[in-house]
Curated annotation (Swiss-Prot):
Record note on cofactor: Binds 3 Zn(2+) ions.
Binding site for Zn(2+) 1: H66, H106, E142
EC class of the enzyme, as a word: hydrolase
Gene Ontology molecular function terms on file: deoxyribonuclease IV (phage-T4-induced) activity; DNA binding; DNA-(apurinic or apyrimidinic site) endonuclease activity; phosphoric diester hydrolase activity; zinc ion binding
Source organism: Photobacterium profundum (strain SS9)
Residues the record lists as binding Zn(2+) 3: H179, D226, H228
Residues involved in Zn(2+) 2 binding: E142, D176, H213, E258
EC number: 3.1.21.2
Alphabetical UniProt keywords: DNA damage, DNA repair, Endonuclease, Hydrolase, Metal-binding, Nuclease, Zinc
Record bears the keyword Metal-binding: yes
Protein name: Probable endonuclease 4
């Protein structure tokens, strides 16, 4: 009945949000990610979506929608920037209509036409504009692998954007483990993962962490290769994910599985849950 209801990748909620892990976080899209324009949400769709969420126990803080891949909030070309901003505001409005409070997005690219700081400033301006147009929804910046001219791969990039946001209660970060590793932050052991997130805390602040994407990496450390792998089968290994499931700093945020093989999602989720049980 509701075609756009769930774009479920396979995910889990960290233990203190729901002790029995019944509540599952959701990776979700509000429209086709490869189109600029979609028809407005109809009221019956909105009503049905909210009813389904209530029926299955999905709370807004456990749903992490992702915006269109076409959007570039740091685009140096005025016409394309305006198009991206309009699309981003539309995504926020859709979230607000559906009762969702988070919107995950890739920050943008300078396209080798402006410097990084100017690109980061445009992204911050774009977020501020969206906040003025749409209430309540939090803009959740996803870190990147640093491929091409993408910004957001250094923790300093994320901090520079956040520093320029007027309402800091409505901005956050989603850390993708594959992107983090590909960007040069080591996650290959529990000790290395602790060091990396200590640096994140110092540069950005753990209080801004609003969600995570859990992926192993096909690329090596610092490769800038955005190629997800199944947990434990890539260059990162299991120790990182054991640490994330057991460390208290990651309580109460959605942890979304974005790995490549749907046939083993259930096994991956069971393994992650076993780390909590064995704590």
């Amino acid at each position: 009945m509701v075609r756009m209801f769930l774009q479920l990748v396979g995910c889990l909620m960290h233990r203190k949000m729901q002790p029995k892990l019944v509540l599952t976080p959701l990776h979700y899209i509000t429209k086709n990610q490869r189109q600029w324009v979609a028809k407005p949400l109809e009221q019956d769709v909105i009503t049905a979506f909210k009813a389904r969420c209530q029926q299955y126990g999905f709370k807004s803080e456990a749903i992490l929608p992702h915006d269109s891949y076409l959007i570039n909030l740091g685009n140096p070309e005025t016409e394309k920037l305006e198009k991206s901003r309009a699309a981003f505001i539309d995504e926020m409005q859709r979230c607000n209509q559906l009762g969702l409070t988070l919107l995950n997005f890739h920050p943008g690219s300078h396209l080798k036409k402006i410097n990084e700081s100017d690109c980061l400033r445009l992204i911050a301006e774009s977020i501020n504009m969206a906040h003025q147009e749409v209430p309540e929804v939090v803009a959740v910046i996803e870190n990147t692998a640093g491929q091409g001219s993408n910004v957001g791969w250094r923790f300093e990039h994320l901090a520079e954007i956040i520093d320029q946001i007027e309402d800091k209660s409505r901005v956050g970060v989603c850390i993708d483990t594959c992107h983090t590793f590909a960007a040069g932050y080591d996650l290959r052991s529990e000790a290395a993962t602790e060091v990396t997130f200590s640096e994140f805390d110092q540069v950005v602040g753990m209080s801004f962490l609003r969600g995570m994407h859990l992926n192993d990496s096909k690329g090596k450390l610092g490769s800038h290769l955005d190629r997800h792998h199944s947990l434990g089968e890539g260059e990162i290994g299991w120790d990182c994910f054991r640490y994330l499931m057991q460390a208290s700093g990651f309580d109460n945020i959605p942890l979304v599985l974005e790995t490549i093989n749907p046939d083993i999602w259930q096994q991956e989720i069971m393994m992650l849950r076993s780390f909590v049980a064995s704590e």
